[in-house]
Design a protein with these regions (language model features):
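Redox-cofactor-proximal catalytic regions of oxidoreductases
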Residues: 35-60
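A short acidic, helix-capping loop that chelates divalent metal ions and anchors anionic groups
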Residues: 62-67
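Flavin (primarily FAD) cofactor-binding/catalytic cores of flavoenzymes
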Residues: 1-33, 37-39, 70-360
Length: 360
């Protein structure tokens, strides 16, 4: 029977693995990290999920424990346990560096290793390559610089002020934590905020409705969904979820405009303010990082154009976990499971057309 290679052992890749196993389709999961869990192994220590634990579980395994909003480390541990429980063929420490087509098959390369498959699922998610502005290279060598993916806790920074560049959720969370030990300026456009506390009874009560809206209303099939997708992909980001503007103000975090220049080694904002800081944390998001794919289909933003996960013009190639891939929640735990079911459904139909016996 035709084999499927799944690239990435985060929640998207393991959700695909679950559906492939359920249908009796052979597959192998390749993970660049030395542990299952993908990017959840690389979050700051105090980071907490925005999604309640009750909505984080993958099929057949509710999220364990009594934490309402688990940490990134707890999410990674859950995913590792999930892969073991289902007996998935996951190969860690395999950094894929090439993908090309060879007739009706794909060749996936990782160093000296080559894997051949009829289907490839790119489940590397929306956070593959840190997006650090080019101007960061012009900052003084005396300024400690970290991207949010490398930030763990305040002990990594030196005494003195901190510019947190990027004012969406990661930037706001990190700025609030750093404010207890440093003078912090948070740079960037205010993205708005969710008015309710996510820990509140009201929010927990309405979360199932929110999840339904993310999955079934805000999709590429609906006008509201298409408008939301355009806004999200244009870099507007999502509203602040846990940290509120008043929290930042109460903690002494100062707001400033976007950083657009560097003068004499110091960051300068769009309105000309020079920030005399000793540290800079770049909470500036990520790039898709698909430059290792030698196939047509990448759009101008570096995303693979797809229809419900099936890459346009490349039969057998699929994506999972991309930002607003099909629905608002495609890049998080709420949306990857239904997206994975769509992708594996198409793989199963391809296998059936080739004469394979596939479980429904």
């Amino acid at each position: 029977m035709d084999h499927t290679i799944v690239i990435g052992a985060g929640q998207a890749g393991l959700a695909a693995g679950y559906h492939l196993a359920r249908r009796g389709l052979p597959f192998t999961v390749l993970e660049a990290d030395d542990r299952v869990g993908g990017g959840w192994n690389h979050r700051w220590d105090s980071m907490r999920m925005f999604t309640p634990a009750t909505s984080l579980g993958l099929p057949g395994a509710p999220f364990p424990g009594d934490e309402l909003f688990p940490s990134g480390a707890q999410m990674a541990a859950y995913l590792s346990s999930y892969a073991q429980r289902l007996g998935m063929d996951v190969r860690t420490g395999v950094a894929v560096d090439g993908l090309f087509r060879d007739g009706d098959r794909f060749q996936v390369t990782a160093g000296a290793a080559t894997f051949t498959a009829a289907n490839v699922v790119l489940a590397t998610g929306a956070e593959r390559v840190p997006n650090v502005p080019a101007l960061a290279r012009r900052l003084s060598s005396g300024i400690v610089q970290l991207h949010s993916v490398d930030y763990r806790n305040p002990a990594q920074l030196q005494p003195g002020g901190v510019a947190v560049v990027g004012a969406a959720n990661s930037g706001a969370d990190i700025a609030l934590e750093l404010a207890a030990s440093h003078d912090v300026v948070l740079c960037g456009r205010h993205p708005g905020h969710v008015p309710l506390r996510i820990e509140s009874k009201a929010m927990l009560t309405v979360f199932p409705l929110i999840a339904f809206t993310w999955n079934h209303v805000l999709t590429r099939d609906t006008p509201p969904g298409r408008r939301s997708r355009e806004k999200l992909l244009s870099g507007h980001g999502t509203p602040l979820i846990r940290v509120k503007p008043q929290d930042l103000a109460d903690a002494g975090v100062r707001r400033a405009a976007r950083v657009t220049d560097v003068v004499e080694g110091l960051p300068v904002t769009a309105d000309g303010e020079v920030l005399d800081v000793a540290n800079a944390v770049w909470a500036t998001g990520f790039l898709p990082g698909h430059d290792w794919i030698t196939l047509p289909g990448l759009d101008s933003a570096g995303f693979l154009d797809n229809d419900r996960g099936s890459v346009t013009g490349q039969p057998g190639l699929y994506v999972l976990g991309q930002l607003f891939q099909h629905r608002f929640s495609s890049h998080n735990s709420v949306g990857v499971v239904p997206d994975a079911e769509l992708v594996v459904g198409d793989i199963a139909r391809r296998a059936a057309r080739a004469g394979a016996s596939v479980r429904p």
